[in-house]
Amino acid sequence: MPRIAFYPGSFDPITNGHLDVVRHAVPLCDRLVVAIGVHPGKKPLFSTEERLRMLEDVCGPVATQAGCVLEAVTFDDLSVTAARKHGATIMIRGLRDGTDLDYEMQLAGMNEAMAPEVHTVFLPASPMVRPITATLVRQIAGMGGDVSTFVPPLVASLLKAKFAG
């Protein structure tokens, strides 16, 4: 039976922190479903289609190199429900610090109550990417700052173009 993992997030935009999680996740599964949560009340910087392409272009080669299939999808329900729909038994969550751990432990407990067959796996961020958040990347890029050390080159180019006009 293939090991399917589900990695949910907004990925607006994908950062080197997200990519770090993907690098650590792909050896754990045969298929990694990277899923963009779509919520009608939120106004993302990048469209869903742009984020899906970013995920495929940036994370796809990392997965392929590890012998893992990457699938970029969207979902608009609970992440644990979406994980089940994709046949995942592993929920991937990245941790930057203790604050993330406290929050993610609560989510993991609730998810386990709703779907005991989906096990949360916490992947600690590598030291170089711990301070990176998509929110800070958007703010820095929006003010003309250089984000090239925080995001993959493709994403840096897309951010520059997004804020050029």
UniProtKB/Swiss-Prot annotation:
Its EC number is 2.7.7.3. Signal peptide: none annotated. One of its GO terms (cellular component) is cytoplasm. It is found in: Cytoplasm. It holds the Pfam family CTP_transf_like. One of its GO terms (molecular function) is ATP binding. The record marks H18 as: Transition state stabilizer. It catalyses: (R)-4'-phosphopantetheine + ATP + H(+) = 3'-dephospho-CoA + diphosphate. InterPro entries: Cyt_trans-like, PPAT, Rossmann-like_a/b/a_fold. It is an enzyme of class 2 (transferase). Its cofactor is Mg(2+). The keyword Nucleotide-binding applies. Substrate binds at S10, K42, S79, R93. Keywords: ATP-binding, Coenzyme A biosynthesis, Cytoplasm, Magnesium, Nucleotide-binding, Nucleotidyltransferase, Transferase. Pathway: Cofactor biosynthesis; coenzyme A biosynthesis; CoA from (R)-pantothenate: step 4/5. Its main location: cytoplasm. ATP binds at S10, F11, H18, G94, L95, R96, E104, V129, R130, P131, I132, T133, A134, T135. One of its GO terms (biological process) is coenzyme A biosynthetic process. Belongs to the bacterial CoaD family. Reversibly transfers an adenylyl group from ATP to 4'-phosphopantetheine, yielding dephospho-CoA (dPCoA) and pyrophosphate. Homohexamer. NCBIfam families: coaD_prev_kdtB, cyt_tran_rel. This is Phosphopantetheine adenylyltransferase. It comes from Bradyrhizobium diazoefficiens (strain JCM 10833 / BCRC 13528 / IAM 13628 / NBRC 14792 / USDA 110). The lineage of its organism: Bacteria, Pseudomonadati, Pseudomonadota, Alphaproteobacteria, Hyphomicrobiales.
